[in-house]
Curated annotation (Swiss-Prot):
It comes from Bifidobacterium animalis subsp. lactis (strain AD011). The keyword S-adenosyl-L-methionine does not apply. One of its GO terms (molecular function) is translation elongation factor activity. One of its GO terms (biological process) is ribosome disassembly. This is Elongation factor G. Residues 10-295 form the tr-type G domain. NCBIfam families: EF-G (TIGR00484), PRK12740.1-5 (NF009381), small_GTP (TIGR00231). Signal peptide: none annotated. It is found in: Cytoplasm. Catalyzes the GTP-dependent ribosomal translocation step during translation elongation. During this step, the ribosome changes from the pre-translocational (PRE) to the post-translocational (POST) state as the newly formed A-site-bound peptidyl-tRNA and P-site-bound deacylated tRNA move to the P and E sites, respectively. Catalyzes the coordinated movement of the two tRNA molecules, the mRNA and conformational changes in the ribosome. One of its GO terms (cellular component) is cytoplasm. Keywords: Cytoplasm, Elongation factor, GTP-binding, Nucleotide-binding, Protein biosynthesis. The lineage of its organism: Bacteria, Bacillati, Actinomycetota, Actinomycetes, Bifidobacteriales. InterPro entries: EFG_II, EFG_III, EFG_III/V, EFG_IV, EFG_V, EFG_V-like, EFTu-like_2, G_TR_CS.
Length: 709
């Protein structure tokens, strides 16, 4: 069935739903789809029936792994109901192992709904996702969910937005009742209350608009006047009017909130309970009222693929040439490769040719769909400002730019963190070998943080990713989707190596004379350490003057150095944090070649590296443990014994919160130990923080193990 697509971009919203794991993100999305008329029956996550969680593993585990995209339509309910809006939603995972899914979704969104747990407020993963949204400049509204939960506290949650995120909350609603008595919300703009009646067959579709309950009037007045103080300052005229009349119209308040939200100066806060069907419709109204349309977002800026110094911008209109960014790839049993794109300008039809400017290759668009979770709705064209799925593209990968062949542009690609954990996998039978290679190639195509490599010495296949859960799911998908049975080794930490000292004027000459044409390349190079804590991985600088090395050979030196860095210095782990500068060298008219200079670059690094004070780096995790007070001493003692350093201790509702930094190698099996120390009453989350130098005693053990001693 073909979908309507609204052509007026003012009425389109591209949004993401983002949160900490278990804050109720997928349930919130399910309710949105139900109330916008996309679903006829609500799917419950805990029953394994959720629409957005369509992979078998997601249904079993009740978590969201891949960001599903869907399109729905909405007419406001709390005011001006005649205008129809199109909302393209991406539901993103909250689990730390799936940060790539979150990163790539945020890159193509115009706005987001941040969902918080009404009892916990801002949690570690909410902070991570919030920072990712800051990085991509995504305006947000906040939805404090689970207001029916025991211990839910709206005002505490709002305070954590201020304190932990350093953000300015704009409270536009107050809850009516809490925990079991939560029945609705007060709208501080209209000064009305929306109350839901618990009639099961209604599923929260209807609510009553009533006067504010007496016991909340005073508090509502106080919060409204704070809201007016905040919004009046956006505009001098507005401030004057507010000071004169002591009030502003609903339209003026909404306009000012929209302005503050789009500028990311403040974040509207709403509340509800998605699971209990309360508060979702006013939140949808807030999505269209406050989050930007593609027209409110600045033009996308890219550069000329043939000259990176030339900036090009594309406006979100049909008149500008076609440009789009690939933000996700997945495999479909029938269509093969599904390529998810955000179209920034122009349009494209099925059958059109486009240029993949990242790879410099032409591609032909087969079919174009708008997705509803895992169902495809064909459309006649992909137009500026919307999100689509293309079929028929052959060599495209995540982060590629697609554009008009006659008007090429390259958009900024996406950066993904390096994997921190790896396991060896081997097929159970010879017949599985080829199937496994094919499956791993397809799966690594889908997820940029999942990598596959073959250990040259042992011949083993190593898969690496952001955490144990991610790798479990990959192995599970190989079994289910590709029918590959394999044995899995124990998880290993993805160590890195770096240098601490500069080595200057390292010289290397590669010379081979064997009848016929020989090989010759001479290089003089400097190798200096970079700041790995700031994510500086590698830099190559060409300072050769006077044509001592011809331009065509310079990239080969660079490639040679990078190849040598891959195989390590001390223990065979990839080297990071190196600035390589080629300062001089020599060529031979006949015997010099790209290969000769690649070997020279590689050998120059290999000879310099042992003199550059090499060290091993290990991934350090930011760990947060929430524990009842009586187990605090045991938990801290245990973290210290794992080479952890305690960063802070705080109080949260009924528990103590310990923040620590602990090496990943010490965290395997931690969940079982924590449960036994606290009788199952403590919980923890961890996420990648940084790489740090391994203490010498530990480094010696690692080197011995790598050498098989």
């Amino acid at each position: 069935m073909a979908l309507d697509v609204l052509t007026n971009l003012n009425q389109v919203r591209n949004i993401g739903i983002m949160a900490h794991i278990d804050a109720g993100k997928t349930t919130t999305t399910e309710r949105i789809l139900f109330y916008t008329g996309k679903n006829y029956k609500i799917g419950e996550t805990h029953e394994g029936a959720s629409t957005m969680d369509f992979m078998a593993q997601e249904k079993e585990r009740g978590i969201t792994i891949q960001s599903a995209a869907t399109t729905c339509f909405w007419n406001r309910q709390t005011h001006d109901p005649d205008e129809k809006f199109q909302i393209n939603i991406i539901d993103t995972p909250g689990h730390v192992d799936f940060t790539a899914e979150v990163e790539r979704s945020l890159r193509v969104l115009d706005g987001a709904v941040a969902v918080f747990d009404g009892k916990e407020g801002v949690e570690p993963q909410s902070e991570t996702v919030w920072r990712q949204a800051d990085k991509y400049g995504v305006p947000r509204i906040c939805f404090i969910n689970k207001m029916d939960k025991l211990g839910a506290d709206f005002y505490y949650s709002v305070s954590t937005i201020k304190e932990k995120l350093g953000a300015t909350p704009l409270v536009v609603q107050l809850p009516i009742g809490a925990e079991n008595d939560f029945s609705g919300v007060v709208d501080l703009i209209r000064m009305k209350a929306y109350v839901w009646n618990d009639i099961k067959d209604d599923q929260g579709a209807h609510y009553d608009t009533v006067e504010i309950p007496d016991d909340l009037k005073e508090r509502a007045e106080q919060y409204r006047s704070e809201l007016l103080d905040q919004v009046a300052e956006t505009d001098e005229e507005l401030l004057e009017k507010y000071l004169e009349n002591g009030d502003l119209s609903e339209q003026e308040i909404r306009g000012a909130i929209r302005q503050l939200t789009i500028a990311r100066e403040a974040y509207p806060v709403l509340c509800g309970s998605a699971f209990k069907d309360k508060g979702v419709q006013p939140m949808l109204d807030a999505v269209v009222d406050y989050l930007p349309s593609p027209e409110d977002v600045p033009s996308i800026v890219g550069f000329d693929p043939s000259d990176e110094s030339v900036e090009i911008d594309r406006k979100p209109t049909m008149d500008d040439p076609f440009s789009a960014l690939v933000f996700k790839i997945s495999t479909h049993p029938f269509y093969g490769k599904l390529v998810f794109v955000r179209v920034y300008s122009g349009s494209v039809k099925p059958g059109d040719n486009v240029l993949d400017s990242t790879k410099g290759k032409k591609e032909r668009v087969g079919k174009i769909f708008q997705m509803h979770a895992d169902k495809e709705n064909p459309v006649d064209a992909a137009e500026a400002g919307n999100i689509y799925t293309f079929v028929g593209l052959k060599n495209v990968t995540t982060g590629d730019t697609l554009c008009d062949e006659k008007h090429p542009i390259s958009l900024e690609s996406m950066t993904f963190p390096d994997p921190v954990i790896e396991v060896a996998v081997e097929p159970k039978t010879k017949a599985d070998q080829e199937k496994m290679s094919l499956a791993l190639a397809k799966l690594s195509d889908e997820d940029p943080t999942f990598q596959v490599k073959t250990d040259e010495e042992s011949g083993q296949t190593l898969i690496s990713g952001m955490g144990e859960l991610q790798l479990d799911i990959i192995v599970d998908r190989m079994r289910r989707e590709f029918k590959v049975e394999c044995n899995v080794g124990k998880p290993q930490v993805a160590y890195r190596e770096t240098i601490r000292k500069a080595v200057m004027n390292q010289e290397y000459t590669h010379k081979k004379q064997t009848g016929g044409s020989g090989q010759f390349a001479k290089v003089l190079m400097n190798f200096e350490p970079l700041d790995t804590e700031n994510g500086e991985v590698y830099e190559f600088v060409n300072e050769v003057t006077g044509g001592h090395i011809t331009k065509e050979f310079i990239p080969s030196i660079d490639a040679g150095v990078q190849e040598a860095m891959e195989s390590g210095i001390l223990a065979g782990f990839p080297v990071v944090g190196v600035k390589a500068t080629v300062t001089d060298g020599q060529v031979h008219d006949v015997d010099s070649s790209e290969m000769a200079f690649k070997i020279a670059g590689s050998m120059c690094f290999k000879e310099a590296a042992p003199k550059a004070k090499p060290v091993i780096l290990e991934p350090i995790m930011a760990v947060e443990v929430r524990t009842p007070e009586e187990y605090m001493g045991d938990v801290m003692g245990d973290l210290n014994s794992r080479r952890g350093s305690i960063q802070s201790m705080n109080d949260a509702t009924g528990v103590k919160v310990i923040d620590a930094k602990v090496p990943l190698s010490e965290m395997f099996g931690y969940i079982g130990d924590l449960r036994s120390k606290t009788q199952g009453r403590a919980m923890f989350t961890m996420q990648m923080d940084s790489y740090a130098e391994v203490p010498k005693a530990v480094a010696d053990e690692i080197i011995k193990a790598q050498r098989g001693e």
